[in-house]
Amino acid sequence: MNKNIFITLLISSLLLLSGCTGDTCIDPDDFGFIKFNVSSRYNPEEITSRQEGDQVAPWRDSAYKVNGYPLTVMVRPWSYILGDKNTSGQLSAWCPWYGQKNNTTTLAAFCVKLQPCTFWDNARLDMCTPNPANQNDAMISNPPCIMTDGVGLYFLIAAKNTDPNISPDSQRKPQGITQHLGELTSSVGYEFYSISSTGQFLPAGGINYQYKGEDKSKYAQSPLYFKIIDKFYDDNSGQYRLVIKSGVTDTRPDPLQFLTDLIKGVLFGKDGIIKKTYQQIIDTPGYRMSVSAILTLYIMFTGFSFLIGNINLTHVELIVRILKVSIVSILLSTDKAWTFFHDYLFVFFIDGVQQILQIINEAAATGPGSQSLLGLLISPQTLSKLFSLLFVDWLGFIYIILYLIALYFIFFLIFKATIIYLTALITIGMIIIMGPIFICFMLFNITRSLFENWLRQLISYALQPIILFAGIAFISMIIRTEIYSTLGFGVCKHDFPNLGPINEIFGSFLEDIDPSLGNSIFYWWFPVPMKGGINNFHKAKILVPEDHIIVDDSCKNDPDKCKHCAAYECIDERYIELPFLDLVKDAKRISNFINGKFVQLDGILLIFVSIYLLSKFNDTAISTAQFIAGTSGNLTDIQKVNQQSYESAAKQMNRPLSYVAKTVSVPVTTRVSAKLEETSMFFAKGFEDIMMGRLEKQALGSSANKAVQNEVKRKYGIDSKDVKMNAITDYENGISGLLKNLPKGNELKAKELSQMKFTQLRDKIAANKYGVKDYAALSEEQKRELDKSLKDANLRELASDANFTKDYQDAYKYAHQEMSGRGVGLFGKNIKPLRSWQEMEHRVDTKRKLKEERRVGIGEKLYAGYTGIKRGALTAIVGKDLRDAYEGNLTSAEWHDFEYNDPRLRTYSEKLKDDEKAREREELQMHINKETLAAQADILSPEYLARLEKAGRQSDVEYYQELAQRKLIHEVRGRLFEEGEPVMMGDRFMREKATDSQMRDMIDNAHRKHAEFIEGDRYTRRQEHYDIMHEKAEGNLEQTYKELKDHFKRDDINIEEMPALIAQKIKDTEQGPEVDAKITEELNNFNADVKNYEYSTEVLNKIEDRKQAITDEVNAQIDQINKYRENAKMEKYVRPIVNEGRKLRKLEDHLRGMK
């Protein structure tokens, strides 16, 4: 069921995403274009006026930078006559004749119905160009009119390191490339076409600018600006809607790229972990001393070998040795070490890899849309076209399902590739951290292989992402081509039902929010044209929207001479409705579209084949990189030189070198390992915090796992139905309301206070309101006043509910982790048969493990007993002192001597006994789990025991209480003996070694741990909840009893007759037709109070029994310590702990006491 819900939510989210395009219609080549609006109006403070009618306005920054490819910008068409609306979401025209301040995105009413401007001889070239010498006005033949198709709009590719808005002169004559977007594209041999809001293909304005000569590299990564140029802006109205189809670097966020940049910043940023750790290593005095020693030895051995003639020191060899000494010497310069090695070595493995991957990704982006394949597949435009197939072809549903399946696999394959890349990135960082150690190893032959292996690993992990993403890019190109060919048609929204007159009232407002909400909140996408037929398709010369190769007669025999065209670089004749399909090569697909067959199943088949290839390539990329790096030869031999053998000198060299290598590696490697562990813990802790936070939210949400909830109910006794999911928020809101009435309430934060218990909260509020230390320091009058404020705010009950909800969240997390620890994975938590099988496997493995441990323990116990007999006999013969002197050779002393690595300093035989108790605890827990599973409830919880006792199952209560007592003893002892500050050390240590102060500290520690155990026990923590329930029920019953007593003038009323007396009292005091309803309501309230009183009384008594059991066990350990003190002739220290609990009376006894 949960799986079906997940699939439903996934499809629903994709459907929702498909409606987030913000457009009424989507062009055939739109798979996620960058859209930008340019207004014809400016704020008065932005405009500079030199003289009347000569205003200069700033250029609008698009926030994008050009990338050197053809810059293609289209201006949306707009026609009021054809049905387009004068709204911010549809308007793409401006009027230079009339406008007001509020006409930044709409036309003035005067201009709406004006005709588009026409020009004498279509001369638009010299119209208001950004040139001070040009004073010409546009040669308009039909004023007044509106400007459309980009007339008057210019783009600016600003020169690098320049700001076109720094001064009025730079605004008028900026440095860079400026072009007018309103020129007739037909003059250059092509046309722009776009689908209007009414679903018609209309000619559009725009420009396709292709760089000349060196401009491509000169202006790469330069900012792009736009501006409507006019001489007087104050009377303008309207805007242009632009679509940037190509030529800019897409800076829109990609989730996986964001994750990569985040981790890279943490590791390799300016203050990254890698740099800090690297500098800490080279700053270590011991490391610097070791490097100095290595250099000294290397120079000494080089001189010695040259003097005795063992090496032929040629010019090349001398240069090589000097370079080695120079490189290693840099490690001694802490200021320059990181800068040198990062800028000349490590940068190739960090930024170099990133640049290569960027080049690969750009090469793989063969058309419009996101550079990321995943971004293309889930873009709103792509999904809108995909879901439009549902009602135009009976195969549409099948295609959509197959597409979603393919999307699922592609997501996980790309995610896997990203994880491989991040792993390689982190590993490169770790290898770089170890660089100061391994760079020193390049000096000597005996350690050179270590340096070579270090460098090979660095190269291997740098190659892995390159090879991996090169393969992904290749497969991505195939998938992109199929997506473009299959879904490269236009779509429009069709509303149902149309709101008609209502739209006239609310349509403009809704369109200002989202242009897609103009007519109805219900809609669906349909292809344009929706029907087949050759008359619905039109040919024209257009810019080809994807990378392709032009094959003509000049290159048929030599394919290398064929021209490669980038997207929107070359012109071809194609159907404007199917711009990605070549008229010759794709004739079959074009025929299918014309005949109304929009679904191309052969395309989805090719996508699945590509996914299979991608999965295989992911598995081989790492081994390929390792193969290349492992067979690249000796990477450190700059040039081979002749060396004579000097075996005798080499043998003498190896001794000090081995010592020096060990001296360098041990302390530094230890520090590096610590830093690496710290780094890994940083990511592990962050991931764990995210997962725990997710589980906490899941526990209180509708997506909570039913299997985990049942586990919580069985093992922790908390039913999710009893949990108030908004209790934490209600508690925080209640505190906020109380703080508003405090004179210094603004000094406290409600969120921090909501994490406290009620008593701690009361102390804080007392200190804030009255300036005292805590609640106990208040006078009686102040206490009554504060208690009334807290009671009016109902904070005690809210705090109890919030703590109960937090306990449930913790139990949910623990149950989820416990199920995972037992081998119950994600599918097991949702599929009951699989979960049962996994649980059974875990129980079998646990029993097998315990059986094996018991068998080993029995053997060790027998041997320990045998050695104990020998030890006792030796003591009787030679005495204790002589035994201790010779015990190691006679009686296996390791069984009876202290384990100094043990925090409790036990002997091995004592540890065996404790291990046996630990096995008993595990066996007991398995038995309790079995009983819990059978009862489908937490058999140890006070609530369950109270219900059993109420049902008269006293034998079961006694049995479960005996199990609870045994488990509680194990838990208390485990808490007392845990590492850190154990309450009890080993028996031999306590008898022979423990001092007076040590034993006093142990007893003090026992008192502290007793309080912590009571405070943290999951059963005793519920006392406040049932205290409130008991007090409410008790108060209501006392009030009812008093009213009956006063009404009937009786002192001998018992509980059994109270319902009849309540009914009689209402009949005596009330009249009218509502008497019966009143009687029913009062009796229901009385019965509920009786039930709550009796239930809470039983539960609270069980909780008190548990607290007393905890106290008794802690006292038993304190008594044992005092026995050791008595045997050592020490005085008894402090009295045992006393549990100050109370036993509540039954309801009959309580009412009897009121008479």
From Swiss-Prot:
Its main location: membrane. GO terms for biological process: protein secretion by the type IV secretion system. Belongs to the TrbL/VirB6 family. This is Uncharacterized lipoprotein RF_0093. It is a multi-pass membrane protein; Lipid-anchor. One of its GO terms (cellular component) is plasma membrane. The chain crosses the membrane at residues 291-311, 395-415, 424-444, 459-479. Keywords: Cell membrane, Lipoprotein, Membrane, Palmitate, Signal, Transmembrane, Transmembrane helix. It is found in: Cell membrane. Residues 1-19 form the signal peptide. InterPro entries: Conjugal_tfr_TrbL/VirB6. Pfam families: TrbL. A lipid is attached at C20 (S-diacylglycerol cysteine). A lipid is attached at C20 (N-palmitoyl cysteine).
